């Protein structure tokens, strides 16, 4: 599917299977989400630009590769995005962080914004938006609309699961934003949940209903 990368690494798929199981505990779900975010983060940052810098090893001076330009921004779609955020910050501790508060109106399935906080220099940074589920895509589209409105031009979207309906809507709304996911599931149900899915990621992370 154009613009969509499915990360099919065996460890990603194994951990995702355990996360899908309804008997997986809240603690286990959180731990697995953090672990899988590290593996997904490796893929979403694969083609970051490098430059060279002169360093001293214990043996000699050398020209060594280092990330070029300003560091990343990880933009977490609250609240479930924070589960992916924690692992990504382990991978890139110097990254800046944006928080986008959105909730889904269960009647209309539309995204409603209640919070936004981001670095001021988004135009100068790669922004990786993280949200475990790309279901209806309403929240993802709204989040990226907001980021673009604040100057972001280089954006990627990282999720755990995606539905075909969500991918179609998202890529039409933001064809310039590549999507990285661990799985494209079968479809959405009448309530807008991904099937077979893993349930509500936020509820499973925090033990809420």
Swiss-Prot record:
InterPro entries: PRibTrfase_dom, PRTase-like, Upp_B, UPRTase/APRTase, Ura_phspho_trans. One of its GO terms (biological process) is uracil salvage. HAMAP family: Upp_B. Belongs to the UPRTase family. The keyword Magnesium applies. Allosterically activated by GTP. The gene is upp. Its EC number is 2.4.2.9. The keyword Zinc does not apply. It comes from Mesorhizobium japonicum (strain LMG 29417 / CECT 9101 / MAFF 303099). Its cofactor is Mg(2+). SUPFAM superfamilies: PRTase-like. Uracil binds at residues 194, 199-201. 5-phospho-alpha-D-ribose 1-diphosphate binds at residues 79, 104, 131-139, 200. This is Uracil phosphoribosyltransferase. GO terms for molecular function: GTP binding; magnesium ion binding; uracil phosphoribosyltransferase activity. Binds 1 Mg(2+) ion per subunit. The magnesium is bound as Mg-PRPP. Catalyzes the conversion of uracil and 5-phospho-alpha-D-ribose 1-diphosphate (PRPP) to UMP and diphosphate. It catalyses: UMP + diphosphate = 5-phospho-alpha-D-ribose 1-diphosphate + uracil. Pathway: Pyrimidine metabolism; UMP biosynthesis via salvage pathway; UMP from uracil: step 1/1. It is an enzyme of class 2 (transferase). The lineage of its organism: Bacteria, Pseudomonadati, Pseudomonadota, Alphaproteobacteria, Hyphomicrobiales. Keywords: Allosteric enzyme, Glycosyltransferase, GTP-binding, Magnesium, Nucleotide-binding, Transferase.
């Amino acid at each position: 599917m154009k613009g969509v990368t499915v990360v099919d690494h065996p460890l990603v798929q194994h951990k995702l299977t355990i996360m899908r199981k309804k008997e997986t505990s809240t603690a286990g779900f959180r731990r697995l989400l953090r672990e899988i975010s590290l593996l997904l983060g490796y893929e979403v940052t694969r083609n970051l630009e490098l430059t060279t810098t002169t360093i001293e090893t214990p043996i000699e001076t050398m020209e060594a590769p280092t990330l070029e330009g300003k560091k990343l921004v990880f933009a977490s779609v609250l609240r479930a995005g924070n589960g992916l955020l924690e692992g990504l910050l382990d991978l890139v501790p110097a990254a800046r962080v944006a928080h986008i508060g959105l909730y889904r109106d269960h009647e209309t399935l539309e995204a409603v914004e209640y919070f936004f906080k981001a670095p001021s220099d988004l135009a100068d940074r790669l922004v990786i938006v993280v949200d475990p589920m790309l279901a209806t895509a309403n929240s993802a589209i709204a989040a990226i609309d907001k980021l673009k409105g604040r100057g972001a031009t280089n954006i990627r979207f990282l999720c755990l699961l995606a539905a075909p309906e969500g991918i179609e809507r998202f890529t039409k709304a933001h064809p310039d934003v590549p999507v990285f996911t661990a799985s494209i599931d079968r479809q959405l149900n009448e309530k807008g949940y991904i099937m077979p899915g893993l349930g509500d990621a936020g509820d499973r992370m925090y033990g809420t209903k």
